[in-house]
Amino acid sequence: MDWILICKALALGIVEGLTEFLPVSSTGHLIVAGSFLRFHPEQAKTFDVVIQFGAILAVCWEYRRRIIDVVTGLPAQREARRFTMNVVIATVPAVALALLFEKTIKSVLFAPVPVAVALVVGGAAILWVEGRQRERSEPARVQSIDALTPFDALKVGLAQCCALIPGMSRSGSTIIGGMLFGLERRVATEFSFFLAIPVIFGATLYETAKDWRAFNVDSVGLFAIGLVAAFVSAFACVRWLLRYVASHDFTAFAWYRIAFGLFVLLVGYSGWIEWT
C-alpha cells in the first residue's frame, strides 16, 4: 500500500465524515472527490460502506450515554420504549422502499442530471422551509426528542424516503422534513443523527453480506485508514453542527447545495468525473 493510496483513502474518509451529517449530500461529494482523486480500487463500493460506518460510529460515541440509557431502560422506562419505537417507525419506510427499488435507483438515478437536480431541489426546499420558519411567530411544536409522537416519527420517516434519490441527502431530508412538520431545529438535527444509526448500520451489514469477499488482508489497512478518518471528521462535524444550529439556520447550506448541483452537472458532462 503506497503513500498516495493512503492519502486518497484519508481524504475520502474526511469528505465522508464532513458531509454525512450536513444537509449537503455525502454521495455527491464522494463521487466528485473520488473521481478527482482517481480513487477507483476494486473494492470502491465496499470502501464507501466502511467510511459510512466510521461516520456513524462518531454519532454513537457522541450520544453513547443516551444510547446506553435507552438500551438499559427498555424493560422498565416508558420514555426509552417510546424513543425506540419512534426510531423504528421513522426507519421502516426508507428501508422498505430501498429494498424494493434498489436496482432502479442505481440504474436510473445515479447520473449527473438526477443528482444535480436533487441537489438544487433540496436547496430550494431548505430555502422554502427556512422562509416559513422566519414567518412563524410561535415556537416550534416539538421542543425535545422525548416529545415526539409516533405520527411525528412517521412523517420524518416518510421525508427520509426522499434521500433514496442520490443527491437529496439523508440528513437534509430528515432535518428539513422534521422542521416542516413542527420539530424545533436542534430537535430535528438530533433526531436525524439517531435515525442514521439503524439506517447506516443496516446498510453496512447488507453491503458486507453481499460483497464480503472484498474484505481481505490487502484491503484491511486501506479500510482502517478511511474508517478512522471518517470517524474523527464526523465527530468534529457533529459537535460543530449542534453548536451551529443553536444560533443559525440552514440557508447557507441551501445556497451551497444549489451551487454544488450546478457544479456536478458541469463536471458530469464535461467528462471530468466518472459515474459508475
Curated annotation (Swiss-Prot):
UniProt keyword list: Antibiotic resistance, Cell inner membrane, Cell membrane, Cell shape, Cell wall biogenesis/degradation, Hydrolase, Membrane, Peptidoglycan synthesis, Transmembrane, Transmembrane helix
Cellular-component GO terms for this entry: plasma membrane
Domain of life, source organism: Bacteria
GO molecular function: undecaprenyl-diphosphatase activity
Matching Pfam families: BacA (PF02673)
Catalyses which reaction(s): di-trans,octa-cis-undecaprenyl diphosphate + H2O = di-trans,octa-cis-undecaprenyl phosphate + phosphate + H(+)
Mode of membrane association: Multi-pass membrane protein
Coiled-coil ranges from the UniProt annotation: none
Transmembrane segments: 85-105, 108-128, 187-207, 217-237, 253-273
NCBIfam families named in the record: PRK00281.1-2 (NF001389), PRK00281.1-4 (NF001390), undec_PP_bacA (TIGR00753)
Family: Belongs to the UppP family.
UniProt protein name: Undecaprenyl-diphosphatase
Protein's gene: uppP
